[in-house]
A protein has these predicted regions:
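Conserved HGGG/HGGXW glycine-rich cap/lid loop of the alpha/beta-hydrolase fold
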Residues: 10-66
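Hydrophobic, aromatic-rich cap/lid helix
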Residues: 162-188
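Active-site loop/oxyanion-hole signature of alpha/beta-hydrolase fold enzymes
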Residues: 45-49, 56-94
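Catalytic active-site module of serine/aspartate enzymes centered on a nucleophile-bearing elbow/loop
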Residues: 223-250
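Conserved alpha/beta-hydrolase "nucleophile elbow" surrounding the catalytic nucleophile
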Residues: 28, 95, 99-101
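Flexible "cap/lid" loop of the alpha/beta hydrolase fold
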Residues: 105-150
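Short beta-strand/loop motif that positions the catalytic acidic residue
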Residues: 195, 201-203
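Conserved alpha/beta-hydrolase "acid-adjacent" motif
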Residues: 208-214
Length: 250
């Protein structure tokens, strides 16, 4: 594990697994971190077995990165800038970017702005990107995640309850997660037509946050869509998720 300093003074944690070829940069979803989203579910191991050079970033507010409680320290653009700053820090000239849920939106922003991105794989998001410009807040409101991070966990139901259970299981800083969620109630994706790199949309068949993933793939000029088994948390654990990702990146 290592850290670098952002433009606004935060220390962000990242991990590197050495390999060959174009580096694969991973960005996890809200509440999760490198271990929860990628290592424990077998994604990193699958990429390692295929010989890839893998890098994973803990987003601000998550994992081993700094976790300010001020919502003003978070935004979609800030987190996209964090990933691009990591490219700079490591001297990366070519990258493949993989993002899940919140990380998928970040990956789209980076791919649309940075010519170093040669391939893009996104999961845990679907038609909400097309219809809402980002996370599908028709399914879960940002304020619901904020509210879920405080009070009695047993009183939180549905998708907000899922995120609360995950936060408690990971020992996440719930006040920081609430600050993240409060800052992300916007539509950062204005257009997908400029993202012309080969892209893969991966979605769980029981994930309401990734509904109609084929519509997201159709909105990207050069994308394919693959549906695997599972809900928002379980889809990444389906062996087909890692296999499809490895095949796409190889």
């Amino acid at each position: 594990m290592a850290k670098f300093t952002t433009w606004d003074g935060l220390e962000l944690n990242y991990r590197v697994w050495e390999g060959k070829g174009v580096p694969v940069v991973l960005q996890h979803g809200i509440v999760a971190d490198t271990n929860a989203n990628w290592m424990s579910l077998g994604v990193v191991a699958a990429l390692e077995r295929a010989g890839h050079h893998v890098i994973s970033l803990d987003a601000r507010g998550h994992g081993r990165s700094d976790k300010p409680h001020d919502p003003a320290r978070y935004s979609w653009q800030a987190m996209a800038d964090d990933m691009r700053a990591l490219f700079d820090h490591l001297g990366l000239e070519r990258v493949a970017v993989v993002g899940y849920s919140m990380g998928g939106i970040i990956a789209l922003l980076v791919a649309g702005a940075d010519e170093r991105v040669e391939r893009l794989a996104i999961g845990g998001i679907g038609s909400g990107v097309v219809d809402c410009g980002g996370i599908d807040w028709r399914v879960i409101a940002a304020q619901d995640i904020v509210s879920a991070m405080s009070g009695d966990a047993t009183a939180v139901k549905g998708l907000p309850g899922m995120f609360r259970v995950l936060a408690d299981a990971l020992g996440a800083d719930r006040e920081a997660i609430a600050a993240v969620a409060a800052s992300l109630n916007e539509a950062p994706i204005q257009s997908l037509s400029g993202i012309t790199v080969p892209a893969l949309v991966l979605a769980g068949d029981a994930d309401p946050l990734a509904a109609e993933p084929e519509r997201l793939a159709a909105a990207l000029p050069n994308a394919e869509c693959v549906v695997v088994k599972g809900d928002h948390l379980a889809a990444v654990a389906d062996p087909a998720f890692s296999k499809t990702l490895v095949d796409f990146l190889s």
